UniProtKB/Swiss-Prot annotation:
Name this protein carries in UniProt: Photosystem II reaction center protein Y
Main location, first listed in the record: membrane
Subunit structure, interactors included: PSII is composed of 1 copy each of membrane proteins PsbA, PsbB, PsbC, PsbD, PsbE, PsbF, PsbH, PsbI, PsbJ, PsbK, PsbL, PsbM, PsbT, PsbX, PsbY, PsbZ, Psb30/Ycf12, peripheral proteins PsbO, CyanoQ (PsbQ), PsbU, PsbV and a large number of cofactors. It forms dimeric complexes.
Record's keyword terms, sorted: Membrane, Photosynthesis, Photosystem II, Thylakoid, Transmembrane, Transmembrane helix
Function statement: Loosely associated component of the core of photosystem II (PSII), it is not always seen in crystals. PSII is a light-driven water plastoquinone oxidoreductase, using light energy to abstract electrons from H(2)O, generating a proton gradient subsequently used for ATP formation.
GO MF terms held by the record: manganese ion binding
Transmembrane segments: 5-23
Disulfide bond annotation, renumbered to this chain: none
Family: Belongs to the PsbY family.
Recorded GO CC terms: photosystem II; plasma membrane-derived thylakoid membrane
UniProt-listed InterPro entries: PSII_PsbY (IPR009388)
Pfam families on file: PsbY
Membrane topology: Single-pass membrane protein
Organism encoding this protein: Rippkaea orientalis (strain PCC 8801 / RF-1)
């Protein structure tokens, strides 16, 4: 594999995983809030 591919894909993967992590955390928080409001 060419090192240039890693230079381009590496930061994209880091950014994508960071976005998924943040969105996932917010979604879980909202879900818990919604469930606690229901009961």
């Amino acid at each position: 594999m060419d090192w240039r591919v890693l230079v381009v894909v590496g930061p994209l993967l880091i950014a994508a995983s960071w976005a998924v992590f943040n969105i996932g955390a917010a979604a879980i928080r909202q879900l818990q809030e919604f469930r606690s409001r229901e009961s």
